[in-house]
């Protein structure tokens, strides 16, 4: 009960009220369970205990208005722009923000997957806007942002989620195309969206940029050379943007997960499913929903609170 409810400071929760409930509870318990009769069964005791906790929670642990504001009202009709939304963490974010009442701009290259996601969401048609967008294409990003319908142009939360990894080659044997794809998506794509969205946030004195980094931006691993470099860049860009926005109410957060079971490894190994499966052998990885929960938590703090960085990993990873 205490873990789920905040004590409400109203006349309901007085010492007298608490005492009355407690005395009634003990009277009932003593009359049923401390007399040498057949009344004191486990079932009877359980019923009394449940009744007791119901009385206590209704009188002394009612949810506060602030709690309801955070979960039910704060996100209502906030415009949330999610890149890489067609699968994985992006799709999980779409689900949790839709459930909270947000309006969603979902962007990805795979149009059919976006449509499938939209169909699966319990959300009104006027609260979702789909964009087929390659974040690596700066001119396409510029045109997309500048030509959003007026009712969608005031973006409140930007989730820079689009990203990928390619290969595990040694640096001196690396594939140039793989390097360029990682740099263009993970760094340039994030920069393009940030550059075209954040000025509006500053002008409106409201907004939140959430960049999806990685534990790879904090520690390198064999074969991760360029990918780790791109995620280290995301970490530095997030810190630099936060400094640039000091004096404004616009917030910046970097969420840096460890192993997450998505299509990430399949993409890394160019569709080699068997090789991708081996990445998670002996490990219970994070799920996209695990990461989306953390992102949603960061986005729903009080406006004066900025969570700069979150590192989350599965218990099986160190």
Pin down the residues of each PLM region:
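Conserved glycine-rich cofactor-binding loop
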Residues: 86-87
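C-terminal helical subdomain
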Residues: 250, 254-255, 274-318
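Residue(s) in the substrate-gating loop at a strand-loop-helix junction
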Residues: 214
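The beta1-alpha1 cofactor-binding region of Rossmann-like NAD(H)/NADP(H)-dependent oxidoreductases
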Residues: 132-143, 176
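Substrate-binding pocket helix/loop in short-chain dehydrogenase/reductase
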Residues: 169-171, 175-183
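Active-site helix of classical SDR
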Residues: 194, 230
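Conserved glycine-rich Rossmann-like NAD(P)H-binding loop of the short-chain dehydrogenase/reductase
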Residues: 102-116
């Amino acid at each position: 009960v205490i873990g789920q409810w905040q004590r409400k400071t109203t006349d309901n929760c007085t010492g007298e009220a608490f005492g009355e409930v407690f005395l009634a509870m003990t009277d009932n318990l003593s009359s049923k369970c401390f007399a040498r009769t057949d009344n004191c069964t486990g079932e009877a005791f359980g019923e009394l205990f449940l009744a007791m906790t119901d009385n206590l929670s209704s009188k002394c642990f009612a949810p506060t208005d602030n709690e309801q504001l955070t979960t039910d009202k704060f996100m209502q009709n906030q415009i949330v722009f999610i890149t890489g939304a067609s699968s994985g963490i992006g799709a999980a974010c779409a689900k949790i923000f839709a459930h909270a009442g947000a309006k969603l701009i979902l962007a990805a290259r795979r149009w059919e997957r976006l449509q499938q996601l939209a169909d699966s969401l319990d959300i009104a048609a006027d609260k979702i806007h789909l964009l087929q967008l390659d974040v690596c294409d700066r001119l396409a990003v510029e045109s997309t942002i500048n030509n959003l319908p007026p009712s969608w142009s005031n973006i409140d939360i930007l989730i820079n989620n689009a990203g990928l990894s390619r290969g595990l080659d040694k640096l001196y044997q690396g594939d140039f195309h793989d390097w360029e794809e990682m740099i263009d998506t993970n760094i340039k794509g994030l920069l393009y969206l940030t550059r075209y969205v954040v000025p509006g946030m500053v002008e409106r004195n409201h907004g939140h940029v959430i960049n999806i980094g990685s534990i790879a931006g904090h520690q390198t691993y064999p074969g991760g050379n360029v990918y780790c470099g791109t995620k280290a860049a995301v970490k530095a860009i997030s810190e630099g943007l936060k400094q640039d926005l000091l004096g404004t109410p616009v917030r910046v957060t970097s969420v840096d997960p460890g192993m997450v079971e998505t299509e990430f490894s399949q993409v890394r190994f160019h569709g080699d499913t068997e090789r991708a499966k081996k990445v998670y052998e002996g490990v219970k990885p994070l799920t996209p929903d695990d990461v989306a929960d953390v992102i949603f938590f960061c986005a729903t703090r009080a406006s004066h609170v900025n969570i700069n960085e979150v590192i989350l990993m599965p218990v099986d990873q160190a």
